[in-house]
Amino acid sequence: MQVIKLLPIFAVANDKQKPTIFTLYGYRFMFYSNDHEPIHVHAIKGNSRAKFDLFPTVALVSSSGVKAHELRLLEQIVVENREHIIEQWLIYFNSDRRYERN
């Protein structure tokens, strides 16, 4: 798996409506500025999209235009970066929400 350097969201966010957490394999892992709980992440590349919930564990919610092998890769990336994604969500939404670390 490709190694990524995780940056604070404000260091890589170039679109205030769609804050980017990181990009990998051409996918932009992000959320929308008006997103809602449960905490989740969107992976977007062109017209390919997938959405993963992070609680209680990582789970695919929806996808469009993503091949099965890419979905497995995206899920693995989200699992491996779950803590960072949650941390960035809480920072961005200025939340002191507590959550169970799995």
Task: Locate predicted features.
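Generic preference for hydrophobic/aromatic residues in regular secondary structure cores
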Residues: 21, 59-63, 81, 98
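Compositionally biased, intrinsically disordered low-complexity segments enriched
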Residues: 4, 38, 42-44, 83, ...
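Short, positively charged and aromatic/hydrophobic N-terminal segments
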Residues: 5-9
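A short, structured beta-strand/loop element
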Residues: 32-68
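Aromatic side chains
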Residues: 27-32, 52, 89-93
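N-terminal first-folded block
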Residues: 10-43
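C-terminal structural segments of small proteins and small subunits
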Residues: 72-102
